[in-house]
Curated annotation (Swiss-Prot):
Entry keywords, A to Z: Carbohydrate metabolism, Cytoplasm, Fucose metabolism, Isomerase, Manganese, Metal-binding
The keyword S-adenosyl-L-methionine appears for this protein: no
Family label: Belongs to the L-fucose isomerase family.
UniProt pathway: Carbohydrate degradation; L-fucose degradation; L-lactaldehyde and glycerone phosphate from L-fucose: step 1/3
GO biological process: D-arabinose catabolic process; L-fucose catabolic process
CC annotations in GO: cytoplasm
Active site as annotated: E337 (proton acceptor), D361 (proton acceptor)
Entry-linked Pfam families: Fucose_iso_C, Fucose_iso_N1, Fucose_iso_N2
Cofactor entry: Mn(2+)
Organism (species): Escherichia coli (strain SE11)
Designated name of the protein: L-fucose isomerase
EC number: 5.3.1.25
Amino acid sequence: MKKISLPKIGIRPVIDGRRMGVRESLEEQTMNMAKATAALLTEKLRHACGAAVECVISDTCIAGMAEAAACEEKFSSQNVGLTITVTPCWCYGSETIDMDPTRPKAIWGFNGTERPGAVYLAAALAAHSQKGIPAFSIYGHDVQDADDTSIPADVEEKLLRFARAGLAVASMKGKSYLSLGGVSMGIAGSIVDHNFFESWLGMKVQAVDMTELRRRIDQKIYDEAELEMALAWADKNFRYGEDENNKQYQRNAEQSRAVLRESLLMAMCIRDMMQGNSKLADIGRVEESLGYNAIAAGFQGQRHWTDQYPNGDTAEAILNSSFDWNGVREPFVVATENDSLNGVAMLMGHQLTGTAQVFADVRTYWSPEAIERVTGHKLDGLAEHGIIHLINSGSAALDGSCKQRDSEGNPTMKPHWEISQKEADACLAATEWCPAIHEYFRGGGYSSRFLTEGGVPFTMTRVNIIKGLGPVLQIAEGWSVELPKDVHDILNKRTNSTWPTTWFAPRLTGKGPFTDVYSIMANWGANHGVLTIGHVGADFITLASMLRIPVCMHNVEETKVYRPSAWAAHGMDIEGQDYRACQNYGPLYKR
């Protein structure tokens, strides 16, 4: 089966079409802008899978309808998923713009005095606004000389932010969300909304009953040699934590081995269902070998599966991580309890950064006073205003231990193409696998347990659906914090000490939901959230605006908020603008 090609970035150099001197004098400068833009993007960006980003430049500069049509024909044949129009001069606004209604688009108008690039930018954006096809504006803060081919830092930042978000939009389009199971314990995010996926993300939902997973395991629809490899890998790398079950519920060695085997099989089969596996065709399972073209998935688990079979914690933790028995690889996106809306936040974070995502319960707000009362410890530093306990039953990506290191030796989570095997091993070494608590998981399983290192910048996100409004996005930038071991132990044992923990301190602004940490917890829209490495809230905001998903709370600096130019016509308050613009334009793929 032919592999689906990755989306490319189209670069559209536009020019003043007047011959006999004007166009001729601008050809080289205009095309050089296009080449410089392409060089920047190919050097600085990668797809989430790690592949190099490709740019496609129009064969000629575009002066009018004919050349715009020729450019569009080329782009259509090369899977261009987003476009950047560049020019140093006046051109003919509506005659030269990209008219594709669902393709993210930006225009860079060169800030120079010799030719009016800014005038074209304004004219073209006016045409976009009038036609209802929003576009992003890129205009350098400082005037450049006509022969200056450098890209200023502020222009570079906008080009990269637009391109990262645009590639995410293009990469999700046409893919599917694999809903493995149905609604888990009444969790609203697992009431999978097909219209949301189709209208806002351009995706399909593949609904599959959990009996399909059971069938694949029971009928050996998997690569048996790979299973042996996975078991050997687990035997070498898994450290096991204490069994906190009552003796009557503790499993013997043979039973524990069977639970481990099935847990690894679940990971293999869910992966095969998502992306396919040619090895299955070799054993006569051609239909199953194709997979479901899923870029993200969710597994219901509780309770219809977990009351009888091993839970999904081990499978989800391994799939969500950047490594397994096959070595370092791109992490998958698999949402616990089939919380599809948290899965979408995970998908956004992965597409923007190429990193693994940490799925967690937004479990407890600990005030400084409560911690001092319970432990005698007074919080300080990043944690001085209180912390949020992010913890789930063990499905968080093992990268979340933050045993990887950046160029300065700081703890972090890296894009998978930068992770060494040594760093993957360090994450495994920092993780214990604890037998699942019988009262919760009667079928057994193993929960991963790790503690996220402190001082690491994170962005916590969540998508919610509001009846009458549609989807909204929440964003909270902050840091992981490290507590003294005795303090952590006291707090952790008050919940479930066999699960992975991140102590999270959001950045406060003193306003609205970010007045204090309690207000952030109080305004969080659901029981789950996602941690993405870095302070990347601005990228999420740009991506959300492309999809027409308003942001209902964030603590990103206003100077970093970057949305289509037409948003400015929807009022003077930038967050109200976002709601009005998203309502006005409707979902990107209107259905």
